[in-house]
Design a protein with these regions (language model features):
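Anionic-ligand binding patches
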Residues: 2-11, 45-218
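N-terminal beta1-alpha1 ligand-phosphate binding loop
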Residues: 2-29
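Cofactor-binding loop segments of dinucleotide-utilizing enzymes, especially the Rossmann-like FAD-
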Residues: 16, 36, 119
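Flexible, glycine-rich phosphate/dinucleotide-binding loops
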Residues: 20, 40-42, 123
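Short loop/helix-cap segments at secondary-structure boundaries that form the rim of catalytic
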Residues: 22-26, 43, 65-66
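A local structural micro-motif
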Residues: 31-32, 209
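A short beta-strand-loop structural module common to alpha/beta enzyme folds
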Residues: 32-42
């Protein structure tokens, strides 16, 4: 059984996303993935940025409630063009074709929300309080090129990004569809803003280097 020193609590990623797992593995290999029991629905009149932040916090707290000693990472990403209508994941080729046709020449705004939570201690109505909590939303602006149907079809043949809002993976071949990307954190668009997460882990006195060293020696 792997053990960590007392100053390094268990780290949990409240997500089953392979993209977020891959990003977190850049920082540490010592974490668990647990699926949060959260219904991901936009509330009436809720701004897309606010929805992303709410869901990130809900995911983290849903898992933290069951693992009170752990540091739990929650994240959510939403895309929009007007701030209020969320752009969903296409799910299949026909929807991805339509989404990329629609995105052609447009500027989309992606909001990647992050929550780091430990010790859900109380509930006040629907609000669950945590002993430690840090939250942030990192914005990314993506300008798409003018996309022909031929280019879209060739892209989807090579990289069927049906599980990505916007239907393109910036970390893969999808970069050829984009004219520009602007963000304070290049990892945010992939799904987990590592710059901000690193800062939050330091705030929580979680030492990435000692945690991995302890795991290697266990």
């Amino acid at each position: 059984v792997e053990t960590l020193p007392e100053q390094s609590p268990q780290l949990i990623l409240a997500s089953t996303s392979v993209y977020r797992r891959g990003l977190l593995e850049r920082l540490t290999s010592h974490f668990k993935q647990i699926s949060p029991d959260v219904i991901e629905v936009q509330k009436p009149g809720e701004a897309v940025e606010a929805m992303a932040l709410r869901l990130a916090v809900e995911k983290a707290k849903a898992v933290a409630r069951l693992h009170p000693g752990a540091l739990v990472i929650g994240s959510d990403q939403a895309a929009t063009i007007d701030g209020f209508e969320a752009i969903g994941k296409p799910g299949h080729r026909a929807a991805a074709m339509e989404q990329l046709r629609w995105a052609s020449g447009k500027t989309l705004h992606f909001f990647t929300a992050l929550a780091l939570v430990r010790g859900v201690t109380a509930e006040h109505g629907e609000q669950q309080l945590a002993a430690f909590q840090r939250t942030a939303v990192v914005g990314t602006t993506v300008k798409f090129r003018e996309l022909s149907d031929t280019l879209i079809e060739h892209y989807l043949d090579r990289e069927p990004a049906y599980d990505c809002a916007g239907s393109a993976k910036c970390e893969g071949l999808g970069i050829v569809l984009m004219e520009s990307i602007q963000s304070e954190d290049p990892t945010a668009l992939i799904g987990l803003p590592l710059i901000r997460l690193s800062q939050f882990l330091a705030d929580a006195d979680y030492d990435i280097f000692s945690a991995d060293s302890a795991a290697d020696c266990a």
